[in-house]
Amino acid sequence: MYNPYSLQGKTILVTGASSGIGQSVAIECSKMGASVVITGRNKDRLQETYDMLEGSGHIQIPADLSSYPEIQKLVDECPKVDGVSHNAGIAKIIPVKRISQENLEEIVGTNAFGPILLTQLLVRNKKINNKGSIVFTSSLSGVYCVHYGESMYAASKGALSGFAKGAALELAAQGIRVNCVNPSIIQTNIFKNEGEIISDEQMQEKIQNYPLKRLGVTTDVSWAHVFFLSDASSWITGINLPIDGGYILI
């Protein structure tokens, strides 16, 4: 049966695949027929993701994308791919007056420098096939809105969205498309992992701010990645797609 969203015959590199959105992207890509190359910092959790993939021909390459030598190693070991899904990222809620160089380097380094440098090396080493697709998980923060304490996080994600537009323009000559998905709050462990725990009561309060009256789940984002990685989006490049349950409408 014809399916323009199929990833059959495509090889997709998925970063941040050991948990959260990245894990969901890897799983959904495998369900759509892709051979998936997964990478993440935590070897044990990366193995868990690998075990959940459907089909065969998948590869796992542990790497910390905040380390340039490890980015280089990942590119060396990675086969040629038809798509790249960038999901590695961290979040910390820190007011402006408490920002330090150390946590600025950590957040911007992981959320912006890592994906940008990985993309640069993949392009320079011709690891992305012509007519390929690059998708960045950015954020609603830094592009459409921002919340208290998110200035560093918003800056890192805003940088990523800006880079994606420039890359889309430059790589269009090779038929390579570059897009961003910009989710609002997605129910993952990203805040808990960083010690910024949002209580159930706070979550219920936040839900009331969304016209669709729920928070996002990982597949809300990973299905958008599948769309951008597939031929169904072959004439779309350089955009930021809000995935927010209608949040920016109010």
Ranges and model annotations:
Residues 18-19:
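Conserved glycine-rich cofactor-binding loop
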Residues 95-96, 103-108, 202, 206:
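Substrate-binding pocket helix/loop in short-chain dehydrogenase/reductase
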Residues 119, 156, 164:
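Active-site helix of classical SDR
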Residues 124, 169-170, 234:
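Alpha-helical segment proximal to the catalytic Tyr-Lys
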Residues 139:
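Residue(s) in the substrate-gating loop at a strand-loop-helix junction
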Residues 172, 177, 236-238:
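Short, small/polar-rich loop/turn modules that mediate ligand/substrate recognition or access, typified
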Residues 214-243, 248-249:
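C-terminal substrate-recognition "lid" of short-chain dehydrogenase/reductases
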